[in-house]
Each structure stands twice: as structure tokens, then as C-alpha cells.
Amino acid sequence: MISEKNSIYFSNNKNEFFALDERTGVIKWKQTLNSNLRPTYADGLVFTVTLEGYLVVIDSRNGNIVRMTNLFEQIKKYKKNNIKPEGFIVARDEIYLSLNNGKLIIIDIKTGKSKNILKIDNGKISRPYVLNNNMYIVRDNSIIKLN
């Protein structure tokens, strides 16, 4: 859940993604998306990633989907069923998406296409965090700093 420009954006466990008026609680718009990740707001757009690995960019004013891109298209079909997004951040011109298999996908924000896939660990890693222009990821009992 995030709050931005007098709206609250969130998803529920019924494959619904909402924008609510922050003051009244009235639904501004609703989309059918199955995401359990925290969305991100940037330049009038709401970004989220579905459980199937689709990057969804939504116009925050009216709820229209601007773009939907399959981020898992480079992953072999038999592996897709076991891979789930863990979290993502929008930073500069890129989106960083962590996966439950220890990989981090770097995505071009303009095209929605994967630029690179980094193997961070063999298991689950956290959503990326940024502090003082450095990115951090938590895995097992350690914190990894990425440059």
C-alpha cells in the first residue's frame, strides 16, 4: 500500500488493485491484477508486478493500463511455475525486481524489457532497498550492498 497525490494504491487477495480517495475512502478506480507486492508511484504512473511476472504500468488518474510487459519471457517455461516476485523498486531509469530464486532482474523503465539478470543467491532474497545512493538486499542472515 502506498499513498501519493491524495490517493491510496493497493491490491488485495482477490486479484483486485485499487485507487482510493485518501480523504473519503471512495474508490477512484479498480483493475483486475493479482499482485501482492507494494506498488510504486512515479510521474503520474503506478507500477506493480503481478505474481506471474508481468510489469504493469497504470495511469494514476483513471486506472487505465498504459503497458503490461512479461518480465519472465527469458525464463524457461518449466522454471516459471516456481518463480515468484518478492519485491521491486523504481530507481532512475530502471526497475529492480527481486525473485524468490535469488535473482535480481534489472528492467528498462521506458520499454519494460529486461536489461540484465543478476544471481544474488541460491534462495529467496528481499525487496531491494536504497539508502544513500546504495542498493541493499537481504538474504538469509546477511545484507548485500550492490553498486
Residue locations for each model-derived region?
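Solenoidal tandem-repeat scaffolds enriched in leucines and small polar residues
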Residues: M1-E22
